[in-house]
Every structure is written in structure tokens, then in C-alpha cells.
């Protein structure tokens, strides 16, 4: 910006000094504009021999200036308009702001559509996109233990907050469902309008307040739009059908009825007046076992929940984005030790729950022995000498399975078919409960892990041993040994913009903070 000012002849040189000397003579706008032009011509050497190229941006044709200015970030254009009147005039060209809207926010709307609504690209950029840029990205709503996943995106001439809902239980491989909860747009050059999308009576007035960095809240101003003529009973049936894909007649288990009714009552008390906290897509590294990201998984009577898989050296963490009254959102539901691979027996032995249990408990016992040895050495005040200590556990030599390709890696056929060397046959042991029997019948790798279980209200939480099973790039599973239960996780295919963490430290801090949001 300082360079632009110097090129224009209105920087901290003779132009500015002369202008300061005239301050006592009054402020005539037309006279000031003429003086700006005179100063630029003087400093460009108008009386001298015509230079080979312009020494001032003001001598460039307007269309060239429009092209130059449209390449600058929109946040810099406000200061550029203060340099001189010619710049101020050129910056009223909507072409500049159309390019900024497209390049910075992906808005590709036709200008004719804008003209019909009486809104300029400058208005869209300044009053909508720039003003609400801080709420774009991924967020977790504060809904007690239930959490959620909100994605705020620019959609045409709107900013829309989409709530992601898992597919109906137990169809974990189906696509996510999306539900709009609010939208922001411009109406006839006025300020941006915020509307609540909750309920079945159409958009209605709402407010958005940016509480602090990485946190904002919404407040519906017309909650009567959320009510239905049939009262709470009709609202409950509608919510049950739309959000869970169920009817009252489908639910026979009394405990499940209680869980569903409890969730409905809890959600209704907020009336779409919620606080949201920013979350990030997990960072990826070439050595990761599979690409990190968001998955939906089966959690018994609690239905399908959204989780986030992330890698931290030789540890993989599965964190709940949505939760339940036992283990709330934000908690680390599964932790996998990638230095503890487990070789599965043949299918016949794998069907025996005791055999699989022995494999897992043997690894747990080894971990406890190593931990006791480390503790004893610390108590004795001596380090582990190289001749006395057991060999340190090394990470799995290759976290990504070898020769991984699109054809040979996802063999779900019968055990009679010949499988690539890195693929093992898999079947659930007898007695292990699964919400979805359509799980893969082959896997790539297995590791020892622990799962978090707790009583109602997150009481008496404890980590219990289990088996992490990598099926393919988009699916993994976990056997909860103590619960005799199996969870299947399938990758969310959705693409998320503006969701990357600014740094690895910021992501780690977010993970730590998430655990305190719901406890």
C-alpha cells in the first residue's frame, strides 16, 4: 500500500507535505482532487521529457488499473481507496469485487441475477462475505452430550449452516444427510439478513453473534415457527421420522425408547438457540495408516454417531463428534496402539470368542508388565540399561499396507478365494453383537486398542481392551471385548472447505478442549 501511494505521488513525499501546509486554508473537495492530480503530474515529471514508461499508476489506463486492483486481496482495497480520488472512483467498478468474491469465496453468480436483486458484488463482498468470514468452516454445537457437526459454507449468494446427520441406523455405508439450520443473505442493498431454518413454517428472523475467536452463537427470534399444530406429540413423531428414520411403532425396546425421548426433550429446550465452537479436519501425513477424517459408526442402542479419526505418531485416536448420555461428544472413544499389531488366527479359531479374547488380553498383560518394569526402574533410581531392558517396542514397520491398490485391497469375498498376502480373512466371534451384519469379511491389519465405556451421565468412565480392525481405506471396526460388541465405521465422503487447522498445535489444543466442552 505504501508503494502504491509513492507511485501515485501522494505518499510521504512532497505531495503530502504540500497538502499538510494547506490544511489551514479550508477543505474544498474539488480543489483537493485537482491538487492531487497536479501533485502526481509534477512528481511524474510532466514538464520534463516524456518518459519511456509511466512513473505513476495514475497515468495508466483505467482498464489496466481495474485489472491490477482486482488481483489484490479484498481486505487491502479499502485502504487503497483512501490513496486518491481516482483510485476511489475505480474501486467502484463491480468487476473488481466480482473477481474477489469468486477467488476468495468461490461465488460464481451471474451479474444479471445480482442486478435483479439490486445488490452489487461490492455489497456481497463487504456486507456478507467479509462480515461473516469468521463463521465459515466446521463447528460443533453445544447440545449437552449429543454434540453435532455443522458446516458453514458460501452457497451462491447465501451463507448457509448445514447440520450433518448420520444415515439411518444401521446403514453406516450410506451417505450423510444435511439439514439447514440458518442462512444469511442480502436484501435490496440492506444489511445482511440472518434467518433461522428450524421447523416447517419457512425461514424466519434470527441473530448471529460472534462471541469470541472460534466461537459464535445463534438466537431464533420467532420460536413460534418451530411449533406444530399437533403439539409436542406431533413434533416428536416428525423429529423421529426425519432425524432417526423411525416411527414409534418401530421401537420395541424400552431402554431405546427412553434414550430417544430423552434426546428429543434435550434438543427441544434449545429451540435452535445454540453456541458453536470451531473444530478442524485432522491433519494427514504420508505415513498414516489410512487417511484421517470423519467417519460414522454404530454404537448399539445409541444408533449411528459421527467420529473423527486422527493420528499422533504411533497412536491413532477416534474422537466423538456426536455423542450420547454415556460417552458424550468430544470424548476419545477409541485409542489404537499402532506398535501392537495382532495377527488373527484362521477363521475357525476366530469364531471362538475365547480365542480372540486371549489374543487381546495377552497384549494387555504384556503392556502391564512393561509398565511395571518401567515404574520399578524409576523407583530404584536407575535407568534401563541396554543389557537388562527388554527390546523397545517398535512401530509397525509399514503403517500403510504394502501393494495397496484399488483392486486387490478391498476383497470382501468368501474365504475360499485366494487373497493378497496383506489381506486376512475376518469374521466376528460368536456372541459378539453387531448392529450391521453386512461388515467386510476380510481385513488388512489389526491392532490392540482400548475403548471408553461409562455409565449414564458419563459416570465411572474407564478404558477397556479391544481390537481395532482395518478393513480398507474407508472402513474400520472395533471389537469391545468387555461389552461383546462390534462397531463398524465408514468414511464420510463429504468435502469440507476452510476446515484445516492453522497448525498441528492448534489441532491438538482443539482435541484437548473438546473433552471439557461436554463434561
From Swiss-Prot:
<dbReference type="GO" id="GO:0043161">
    <property type="term" value="P:proteasome-mediated ubiquitin-dependent protein catabolic process"/>
</dbReference>
<comment type="pathway">
    <text>Protein modification; protein ubiquitination.</text>
</comment>
<dbReference type="InterPro" id="IPR036047">
    <property type="entry name" value="F-box-like_dom_sf"/>
</dbReference>
<comment type="similarity">
    <text>Belongs to the FBXO31 family.</text>
</comment>
<dbReference type="GO" id="GO:0006974">
    <property type="term" value="P:DNA damage response"/>
</dbReference>
<keyword id="KW-0131">Cell cycle</keyword>
<keyword id="KW-0833">Ubl conjugation pathway</keyword>
<dbReference type="InterPro" id="IPR045048">
    <property type="entry name" value="FBXO31/39"/>
</dbReference>
<dbReference type="GO" id="GO:0019005">
    <property type="term" value="C:SCF ubiquitin ligase complex"/>
</dbReference>
<dbReference type="GO" id="GO:1990756">
    <property type="term" value="F:ubiquitin-like ligase-substrate adaptor activity"/>
</dbReference>
<feature type="binding site">
    <location>
        <position position="220"/>
    </location>
    <ligand>
        <name>Zn(2+)</name>
    </ligand>
</feature>
<dbReference type="Pfam" id="PF12014">
    <property type="entry name" value="Cyclin_D1_bind"/>
</dbReference>
<keyword id="KW-0862">Zinc</keyword>
<dbReference type="Pfam" id="PF12937">
    <property type="entry name" value="F-box-like"/>
</dbReference>
<dbReference type="GO" id="GO:0016567">
    <property type="term" value="P:protein ubiquitination"/>
</dbReference>
<protein>
    <recommendedName>
        <fullName>F-box only protein 31-A</fullName>
    </recommendedName>
</protein>
<feature type="binding site">
    <location>
        <position position="204"/>
    </location>
    <ligand>
        <name>Zn(2+)</name>
    </ligand>
</feature>
<keyword id="KW-0479">Metal-binding</keyword>
<keyword id="KW-0227">DNA damage</keyword>
<keyword id="KW-0963">Cytoplasm</keyword>
<feature type="domain" description="F-box">
    <location>
        <begin position="54"/>
        <end position="100"/>
    </location>
</feature>
<feature type="region of interest" description="Disordered">
    <location>
        <begin position="369"/>
        <end position="424"/>
    </location>
</feature>
<dbReference type="GO" id="GO:0005737">
    <property type="term" value="C:cytoplasm"/>
</dbReference>
<dbReference type="InterPro" id="IPR001810">
    <property type="entry name" value="F-box_dom"/>
</dbReference>
<comment type="function">
    <text>Substrate-recognition component of the SCF(FBXO31) protein ligase complex, which specifically mediates the ubiquitination of proteins amidated at their C-terminus in response to oxidative stress, leading to their degradation by the proteasome. Fbxo31 specifically recognizes and binds C-terminal peptides bearing an amide: C-terminal amidation in response to oxidative stress takes place following protein fragmentation.</text>
</comment>
<comment type="subunit">
    <text>Part of a SCF (SKP1-cullin-F-box) protein ligase complex SCF(FBXO31).</text>
</comment>
<dbReference type="GO" id="GO:0031146">
    <property type="term" value="P:SCF-dependent proteasomal ubiquitin-dependent protein catabolic process"/>
</dbReference>
<feature type="binding site">
    <location>
        <position position="226"/>
    </location>
    <ligand>
        <name>Zn(2+)</name>
    </ligand>
</feature>
<feature type="binding site">
    <location>
        <position position="196"/>
    </location>
    <ligand>
        <name>Zn(2+)</name>
    </ligand>
</feature>
<dbReference type="GO" id="GO:0031571">
    <property type="term" value="P:mitotic G1 DNA damage checkpoint signaling"/>
</dbReference>
<dbReference type="GO" id="GO:0034599">
    <property type="term" value="P:cellular response to oxidative stress"/>
</dbReference>
<dbReference type="GO" id="GO:0031145">
    <property type="term" value="P:anaphase-promoting complex-dependent catabolic process"/>
</dbReference>
<feature type="compositionally biased region" description="Basic and acidic residues">
    <location>
        <begin position="369"/>
        <end position="390"/>
    </location>
</feature>
<feature type="region of interest" description="Disordered">
    <location>
        <begin position="11"/>
        <end position="37"/>
    </location>
</feature>
Amino acid at each position: 500500500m505504501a508503494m502504491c501511494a509513492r507511485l501515485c505521488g501522494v505518499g510521504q513525499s512532497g505531495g503530502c507535505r504540500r497538502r499538510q501546509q494547506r490544511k489551514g486554508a479550508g477543505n474544498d473537495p474539488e480543489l483537493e482532487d485537482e491538487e492531487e492530480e497536479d501533485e502526481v503530474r509534477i512528481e511524474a515529471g510532466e514538464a520534463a521529457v516524456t518518459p519511456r514508461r509511466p512513473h505513476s499508476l495514475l497515468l495508466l489506463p483505467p482498464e489496466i488499473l481495474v485489472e491490477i486492483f482486482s488481483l489484490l486481496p479484498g481486505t487491502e482495497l479499502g485502504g487503497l481507496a483512501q490513496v486518491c480520488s481516482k483510485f476511489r472512483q475505480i474501486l467502484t467498478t463491480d468487476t473488481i469485487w466480482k473477481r474477489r468474491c469468486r477467488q476468495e469465496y468461490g461465488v460464481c453468480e451471474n451479474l444479471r441475477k445480482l442486478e435483479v436483486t439490486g445488490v452489487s458484488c461490492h455489497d456481497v463482498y463487504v456486507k456478507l462475505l467479509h462480515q461473516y468470514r469468521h463463521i465459515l468452516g466446521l463447528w460443533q454445537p453445544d447440545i449437552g452430550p449429543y454434540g453435532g457437526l455443522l458446516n458453514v459454507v458460501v452457497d451462491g449468494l447465501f451463507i448457509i449452516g448445514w447440520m450433518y446427520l448420520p444415515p439411518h441406523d444401521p446403514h453406516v455405508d450410506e451417505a450423510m444427510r444435511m439439514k439447514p439450520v440458518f442462512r444469511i443473505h442480502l436484501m435490496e442493498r440492506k444489511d445482511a439478513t440472518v434467518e433461522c431454518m428450524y421447523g416447517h413454517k419457512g425461514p424466519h428472523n434470527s441473530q448471529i453473534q460472534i462471541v469470541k475467536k472460534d466461537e459464535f452463537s445463534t438466537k431464533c427470534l420467532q420460536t413460534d415457527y418451530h411449533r406444530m399444530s399437533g403439539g409436542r406429540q406431533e413434533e416428536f413423531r416428525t423429529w423421529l421420522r426425519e432425524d432417526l428414520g423411525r416411527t414409534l411403532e418401530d421401537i420395541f425396546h424400552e431402554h431405546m425408547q427412553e434414550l430417544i425421548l430423552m434426546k428429543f426433550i434435550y434438543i427441544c429446550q434449545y429451540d435452535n438457540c445454540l453456541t458453536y465452537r470451531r473444530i478442524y479436519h485432522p491433519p494427514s501425513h504420508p505415513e498414516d495408516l489410512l487417511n484421517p477424517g470423519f467417519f460414522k459408526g454404530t454404537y448399539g442402542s445409541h444408533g449411528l454417531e459421527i467420529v473423527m479419526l486422527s493420528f499422533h505418531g504411533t497412536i491413532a485416536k477416534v474422537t466423538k463428534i456426536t455423542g450420547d448420555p454415556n460417552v458424550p461428544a468430544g470424548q476419545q472413544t477409541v485409542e489404537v496402539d499402532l506398535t501392537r499389531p495382532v495377527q488373527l488366527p484362521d477363521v475357525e479359531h476366530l469364531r471362538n470368542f475365547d480365542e480372540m479374547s486371549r489374543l487381546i488380553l495377552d497384549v494387555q498383560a504384556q503392556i502391564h508388565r512393561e509398565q511395571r518394569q518401567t515404574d520399578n526402574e524409576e523407583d530404584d533410581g536407575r535407568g534401563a540399561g541396554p543389557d537388562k531392558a527388554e527390546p523397545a517396542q517398535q512401530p509397525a514397520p509399514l503403517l500403510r499396507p504394502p501393494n495397496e491398490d484399488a483392486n486387490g485391497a478391498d476383497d470382501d469375498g468368501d474365504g475360499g478365494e485366494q487373497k493378497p498376502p496383506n489381506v486376512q480373512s475376518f469374521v466376528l466371534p460368536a456372541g459378539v453383537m453387531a448392529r450391521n451384519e453386512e461388515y467386510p469379511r476380510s481385513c488388512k491389519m489389526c491392532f490392540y486398542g482400548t475403548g471408553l465405556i461409562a455409565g449414564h451421565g458419563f459416570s465411572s468412565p474407564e478404558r477397556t481392551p479391544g481390537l481395532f480392525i482395518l478393513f480398507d481405506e474407508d472402513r474400520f471396526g472395533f471389537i469391545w471385548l468387555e461389552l461383546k460388541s462390534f462397531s463398524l465405521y465408514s468414511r464420510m465422503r463429504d468435502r469440507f472447505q476452510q476446515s484445516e487447522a492453522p497448525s498441528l498445535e492448534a489441532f491438538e489444543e482443539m482435541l484437548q478442549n473438546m473433552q471439557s466442552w461436554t463434561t
